[in-house]
Amino acid sequence: MSSTPKVLRGCCGIGLWALLLTPTWASWQDAVPGAQIIGTGDFSVFGFDVYNARLWSAARPLADGQPFALELIYRRSVSREDLVKASVDEIKRLAGSSISPAQLAVWQAQMQQSFVDVQAGTRITGVYLPGQGARFFVGQQLQHEINDPLFAQAFFNIWLDPRTRNPELRQQLLGTAKP
C-alpha cells in the first residue's frame, strides 16, 4: 500500500491547523472595518522624502474612541533602531515626566519587536485599538501586538497630538489642511 495518502493527510492536517490558528485579524483592515482614507501627507527631513503617511478610519472626521490605522509607506531605507529611537524620543518629548524611564524601556523593547528595517516601498501600518493597544503590520502581515492602551495613545500622539513636530502633516492626515 502506498504511503502517499498518509503524507497527504499529514500535509492537509498541518494546513488546517495553520488556518485555524490564523487570527481573525489577519490584516489591518479586519481591525478597522469600513476604513476609508481620512487624509494623506508626506514626511521629509532636510528635503529628503522619508515616507508617505495615510490615516484610515471608518469615522470621518476621526472620532475619539474609534479604531484607526496609520499607514507609512517608506521612500528610503531606515533601520529598525533608528525608527525605535525616533519614536522613543518623540514619546518622551510629548509625554514629559508622565512616562517613567522604566516604562519607556518596556515600550522600546515592544517597538523593537513591532518594527523592521525598512527599504523604499516597505509599508508599516499601525492600528490604534481604543482601550486595548496597538497592532503593527508589515505589508499585510501582523508583525507584533502591544496590549497597552497607554502605549497606543503615546505612540499615535507622535503624529496626531497638536504638539507634534509636523503640524502640517497632522492637518493633512486629519483632513483639515487648507488648500
Each predicted region: which residue ranges?
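Terminal leader/tail segments of proteins
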Residues: 25-179
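Bacterial N-terminal signal peptides
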Residues: 11-23
